[in-house]
A protein has these predicted regions:
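N-terminal [4Fe-4S]-dependent radical SAM core
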Residues: 1-2, 182-224, 637-640, 646-650
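A short, flexible N-terminal coil/short beta segment enriched in small residues
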Residues: 1-20
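Radical SAM enzyme core and accessory elements
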Residues: 2-8, 46, 59, 156-159, ...
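Conserved, mostly hydrophobic/aromatic
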Residues: 26, 61, 185, 231, ...
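A structural motif corresponding to the C-terminal lobe/cap of the Radical SAM core domain
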Residues: 57, 280, 292-295, 299-308, ...
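Radical SAM [4Fe-4S] cluster-binding motif and immediate context
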Residues: 206-360
Length: 653
């Protein structure tokens, strides 16, 4: 009998650790069981997935269900049942665990649901199906009996076929599918009734085998790893709050398994632990090992609560290779009333102190999260939270929108919060008592601008100037979102270069409006017209505001610090007057390398193509060296020079 565990991932680079864990555990308990894994993505053509499943000819198909793939999976299930009518289809995962009876009532093609953790439940299901197979039901695809034993064909799954009762006939107990002894399942009986049994016992994580015995198939993909399950916290929007039991895998197992990844030079290992640092000894044991055995390549991703870091943990982070680890830190809100209402325990002062400390090391990528749509948080309150988190200088600021997950405490408070949300996955907030849908739309626009202009990491110099121009960080993205909407730019896939052009036009228009305000407010002399203002010269001693020329320089810097671009934007200044200086610089580097020390064997013309020297409107030159890149951001090395005309010397500025 063939079992297929099917995972529909969001992207190709993702993998599904759940199905691998189920297979690994079942194989240790039932050696020889024929269990395959089929991994697909929601970007696959559904027809191709259907074809692949059909060619495998599984007798049992288990689908791993989440909010982002459940609709896709149910479409596949309905078609699979048409082409493989005898296949038993089971579902598992958080999206079906909390209303399993409703799912079965709604989806007649599904035989059953594995609720909660699935390793033990799936193994017992495999054993039950194999026990039924011992009666040698003929293979539904070839007509040949399983294991070569000729037996009379029976239809164990037909809804109208009467199954023998206990005690009827020889082997009566083995020729029917006996599921009543399996905890953690909700299933449809042969008569069509839906039955549900109590929860499955929780395994020790040490009982679950390491499922990455072979790295073939994981090339260029994120590898997921689990060193703990559960969460000690009770955040109302999260399913982890339901079970506060936290279990840890012994370090005696964890450390050799991490060495396996290091030996295979896996690019990234993402820990799926809900709060990785909730147990100090566990955290330090793993991090010390990674520091001592660093291969210089592998990056490890952790979800942490930064406010519970102690001095020893922070000092250890400071000793790490740049890029060895990255941290995802859930802040969600800085509104005290909101934090209290969602049952979140967080010391914002300690959190900020820890984030600032790690930032100062400049060796660890930090990803900070916010959630819009939480109780007691209106538009202005969320913007204050946004500004607070932005000022912590995260490498990425992730704006999420509340998902009302089945089984969560948040779902119970829908009426109290006047919470409206999408009726289909991912059940995202539409409005609350504090946040109307009109403000949700505004925040969606802000989210888009944050992704493009901040999280992309492609505008670092320009963002610093924008922070000077606007009073609050949030104003940058609010104004950009309004500009996109006003000019019909929203919802369009723009090229990288186009994003720079749009930002420049936005600044140009914004400064013109400010220019008009200045002119209107200026006192006009009786003998002449209004004073002529130009955006080029907007910087002045009174405001210290950057000029349009400053932004032009910063945008060119941001473009070249990422890559040696071939196409220049329309706002780029003419570089032809500086050909002589550029040529002389590279000739000097060829003769006596001072700055381009990694270009031995290349002549000045080749260097000029491999590196780039840009004249800026402030009179300086910036050298971009693409052989020297920042290990954290990936940006090219950049040095600013002043050219001393006549002396033909370059001085770093």
């Amino acid at each position: 009998m063939k079992f297929l565990l099917a995972a529909i991932n969001a992207k190709y680079i993702h993998s599904n650790p759940g199905v691998y864990s189920l297979r690994a555990f079942a194989r240790t308990k039932i050696p020889g069981a024929d269990i395959e894994i089929g991994e697909y993505t929601i970007n696959h053509q559904m027809d191709l997935i259907l074809q692949d499943i059909y060619r495998r000819k599984p007798d049992f198909i288990g689908f791993s269900c989440y909010i982002w793939n459940i609709s896709y999976i149910m479409e596949i299930v309905r078609d699979v049942k048409k082409v493989l009518p005898e296949a038993e289809i089971w579902l598992g995962g958080p999206e079906v665990s909390y209303d399993a009876k409703k799912v079965l009532t709604r989806e007649p093609d599904v035989r059953g649901i594995m609720r909660g953790e699935g390793e033990l439940t799936f193994t017992e299901l495999v054993r039950a199906y194999l026990q039924r197979e011992k009666t040698s039901v003929p293979d539904r695809y070839t007509g040949e009996s399983f294991r070569g034993q000729a037996k009379e064909k029976t239809s164990c799954c037909a809804e109208n076929t009467r199954m023998p009762e206990a005690g009827e006939g020889e082997n009566a107990h083995s020729d029917r599918l006996e599921l009543s002894h399996i905890p953690g399942i909700t299933y449809r009986t042969e008569s069509g009734e839906i039955e549900e049994y109590g929860p499955q016992r929780l395994l020790s994580l040490d009982e679950i085998p390491f499922y990455y015995d072979d790295m073939a198939g994981f090339e260029n993909r994120i590898v997921y790893y689990e060193s703990s399950r559960g969460c000690p916290f009770s955040c109302s929007y999260c399913l982890s709050s339901i079970d506060k039991t936290v279990r840890f895998r012994s370090l005696d197992l964890v450390l050799p398994e991490l060495q396996f990844f290091l030996d295979h030079k896996v690019p990234q290992v993402k820990f799926v632990d809900r709060t990785f640092n909730c147990k100090r000894e566990h955290t330090l044991g793993i991090w010390r090992y990674l520091v001592e055995h660093d291969n210089g390549i592998t990056n490890f991703h952790f979800e942490v609560s930064a406010d519970i870091f102690d001095e020893e943990e922070l000092e250890l982070i400071g000793k790490m290779r740049p890029g060895l680890i990255q941290l995802e830190i859930g802040v969600q809100s800085t509104n005290p009333d909101t934090i209290r209402e969602i049952h979140r325990h967080m010391d914002l002062v300690k959190l900020k102190r820890a984030v600032d400390r790690v930032y100062d090391y400049r060796n660890t990528h930090q990803h900070l999260d916010l959630i819009a749509g939480l109780p007691y948080e209106n538009y202005e309150s969320f913007m204050r939270s946004f500004d607070d988190v932005y000022r912590m200088r995260p490498d990425q600021l992730q704006m999420g929108f509340l998902k009302v997950l089945k089984g969560s405490y948040m779902e119970e408070q829908v009426a109290a919060y006047d919470l409206k949300y999408r009726g289909i996955p991912p059940y995202e907030v539409l409005s609350t008592k504090w946040l109307p849908y009109s403000d949700v739309i505004r925040l969606k626009g802000v989210e888009d601008m944050v992704e493009v202009y901040y999280n992309s990491g492609q505008f670092p110099a320009t963002m610093k100037l924008l922070e000077k121009r606007f009073q609050r960080p949030s104003e940058i993205f609010v104004n950009l979102a309004e500009y996109y909407e006003k000019n019909g730019l929203t919802g369009i896939s723009h090229s990288r270069l186009a994003r720079y052009e749009i930002l420049y036009r936005f600044l140009e228009e914004d400064m013109r409006e400010e220019e008009r305000d200045h002119v209107t407010a200026a006192k006009v002399p009786e003998t002449g017209g209004a004073k002529e203002w130009t955006a080029e010269k907007m910087e002045n001693a009174e405001t210290g505001q950057p000029s349009l020329a400053d932004f032009r320089d910063s945008l060119m810097y941001d473009l070249y610090v990422r890559e040696n671009i071939k196409s220049r934007p329309s706002f780029a200044s003419d570089q032809s007057p500086y050909k002589k200086e550029v040529r002389e610089f590279f000739m000097a580097e060829e003769e006596n390398p001072k700055w381009l020390t990694d270009y031995a064997g290349f002549d000045s013309r080749q260097m000029a193509k491999m590196a780039h020297l840009e004249h800026m409107e402030d009179g300086t030159f910036v050298l971009f060296d693409y052989k020297k890149r920042d290990p954290l951001s990936g940006n090219a090395g950049a040095v600013r020079f002043v050219y001393k005309d006549g002396e033909e010397t370059w001085q770093m500025k």
